[in-house]
Amino acid sequence: MTSKAMLYFSYTKPKVWSLLVFVGAIGAVIAIPYFNLHYISLIVLATIAVMLGSMGAEATTNYIDKDIDAVMSRTMKRPLVTGQIKPINGLLFGLVLMFLSIAILAAFGKLYAALFMGIGLFDNVFIYSYLTKRRTPWNIILGGFSGGFPVVIGWYTVTSKFSILPWFLFLLVVVWIPIHVWSLAYRYRDDYNRAHVPMMTSIHNDRISAICISSAAIILFAFSIIPAFFRVMPMVYMILASAIAVPMIFYSIVFVRHPDRKNSLKLFIYSSPYLAIIFVLVLIFRFL
């Protein structure tokens, strides 16, 4: 891969969208009744579409946020800020990728998946980044729905049959996003204050922020075991999911008792693998 291609690839923030592509692929796999070449090709289609959409959304929001990125220490080295990529080129790159993500699904007749892709992109780019990020601390709640759509897109790329399972997973990701974003935002609250972005952690004191973040962690745990109560996952899944949640709940309690950046970072670091592990458990028990 050339240095220019690598630059544009890094511009899409692969560390951000890689987990979304993962849950999108899981959403496709759990929808198949058995493995054959046809279903494998649909899994690949879903994965490519989610990757294109996620890359496009991140590239476009980079354009929208370029003035914010310029004053935040965590983001001031991004390509639009440093001038490595011209703003118009960055915007067009993002728009083309988003268009391709919808077009490729529509071209293969996956209209439900294309519709959900469009809704997810609209929520991420317009509702979150353009409309609410600079105006309300509810920004990540209103814009968090976009993070749940990859699993639904994966499911409806494979089948048009309704199931409650992908929507449970959709809600799980939506609930996961606040704890993941807020625990990181707490660490960089000075950056958000400097950029005048009203994140929940930048407008409330340490204790309230810690309570909100830790409450989100408890809600995430509750949502992760709900599928067992609706009999779409076995009880052994609930037991394992509960065991995996113990460190997260522990870190949440510690964070409330001692709200500081060190403890918020511990919660942030654990939240990413937690979601991935839950999805792996769902995948395993789907086929057992």
UniProtKB/Swiss-Prot annotation:
Record bears the keyword Membrane: yes
Swiss-Prot/TrEMBL keywords: Cell membrane, Heme biosynthesis, Membrane, Transferase, Transmembrane, Transmembrane helix
Catalysed reactions, semicolon-separated: heme b + (2E,6E)-farnesyl diphosphate + H2O = Fe(II)-heme o + diphosphate
Membrane topology: Multi-pass membrane protein
Domain of life of the native organism: Archaea
Pfam entry (one): UbiA
HAMAP family: CyoE_CtaB
Note: Carbon 2 of the heme B porphyrin ring is defined according to the Fischer nomenclature.
Protein name (record): Protoheme IX farnesyltransferase
Organism annotation: Thermoplasma acidophilum (strain ATCC 25905 / DSM 1728 / JCM 9062 / NBRC 15155 / AMRC-C165)
Lineage: Archaea, Methanobacteriati, Thermoplasmatota, Thermoplasmata, Thermoplasmatales
